From Swiss-Prot:
Lineage of producing organism: Bacteria, Bacillati, Bacillota, Bacilli, Bacillales
Cross-referenced NCBIfam families: rpmF_bact
Cellular component GO terms, alphabetical: large ribosomal subunit
A Pfam family: Ribosomal_L32p
Domain of life: Bacteria
Keyword Flavoprotein tagged: no
The keyword DNA damage is assigned to this record: no
InterPro entries (UniProt xref): Ribosomal_bL32 (IPR002677), Ribosomal_bL32_bact (IPR044957), Ribosomal_zn-bd (IPR011332)
BP terms from Gene Ontology: translation
Single GO term (MF): structural constituent of ribosome
Keyword annotations from UniProtKB, A to Z: Ribonucleoprotein, Ribosomal protein
Protein family per UniProt: Belongs to the bacterial ribosomal protein bL32 family.
Name of the protein this chain belongs to: Large ribosomal subunit protein bL32
Length: 57
């Protein structure tokens, strides 16, 4: 079975993991109630989407 010659250093390990991170979701302010919501989705607070009442609370 193949094994590495040397132990992977902390620096090399961290350089490899630079792209391994969480991204912040795209939050926007609802134009109707001012609550923060995910873009292109119905507002959970007031139930509107693109200025129309879609869901009832």
């Amino acid at each position: 079975m193949a094994v590495p010659f040397r132990r992977t250093s902390k620096t090399r390990k961290n350089k490899r993991r630079t792209h391994f991170k969480l991204e912040v979701p795209g939050m926007v302010e609802c134009p109707e109630c001012g609550e923060y919501k995910l873009s292109h989705r119905v507002c959970k607070a007031c139930g509107t989407y693109k200025g129309e009442k879609v869901a009832s609370k």
